A protein has these predicted regions:
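Short, solvent-exposed loop/helix junctions and linker helices
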Residues: 33-36, 87
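Helical substrate-recognition/capping region of FAD-dependent monooxygenase/halogenase enzymes
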Residues: 48-177
Length: 177
């Protein structure tokens, strides 16, 4: 297995992403997914720093958020490669894994791991959804219904009030959100 990962995701002005930050076996086709996720995570941060609306220390969060995700993918692909071996012990293990994947919950969990839909950034204590991926839902805006993904195309943070209308005063943030 040739899997490896950069120790640091930021060295002054160098910010590796995708295969420059981590390489692993192509098993499961996760390389493209994780590379795109790196780019999305880093892209909006770079835009904020270049525009001067966020300090350059924002780029330090790239390491904290993406490095653990890539380390997990490397372990997952290492396990997948190991399960391809043809020896008797691996074949026994593979049969046990197949039995587990015949069950609903293990199959859903593994599917989420393989697709990257289970990614959660660890921001500490708070709401259970903090750091989780937002589904691309239809939301109602002042301009009418829109998909969440269309709100993210301007490289600006998006504040979604999922509670009562006009409950939050974001006046101090209007130039950033």
């Amino acid at each position: 297995d040739m899997g490896r990962q950069a120790a640091r995701y930021r060295e002054r002005r160098a910010l590796p992403a995708g295969d420059a930050a981590h390489v692993h076996a192509p098993t499961g086709g996760q390389g493209l997914n994780i590379g795109v996720q790196d780019a999305v995570n880093l892209g909006w941060k770079l835009a904020q720093v270049v525009r001067g609306t966020s300090p350059s220390t924002l780029l330090d969060t790239y390491q904290a958020e993406r490095h653990p995700i890539a380390a997990r993918v490397l372990k997952l692909t290492m396990a997948q490669v190991a399960l391809m071996r043809g020896d008797e012990r691996t074949m026994a293990l593979r049969e046990n894994v197949q039995e587990l994947l015949a069950m609903d919950q293990p199959r859903k969990r593994y599917g989420a791991m393989m697709s990257g839909l289970d990614i959660r950034y660890d921001f500490g204590e708070g709401h259970a959804l903090l750091g989780r991926r937002m589904p691309d839902l239809d939301v109602v805006t002042a301009d009418g219904p829109r998909r969440v993904s269309t709100l993210l195309q301007e490289a600006r943070p998006v504040f979604l009030n999922l509670g009562e209308p006009s409950r939050f005063d974001i006046g101090a943030w209007t130039d950033r959100v």
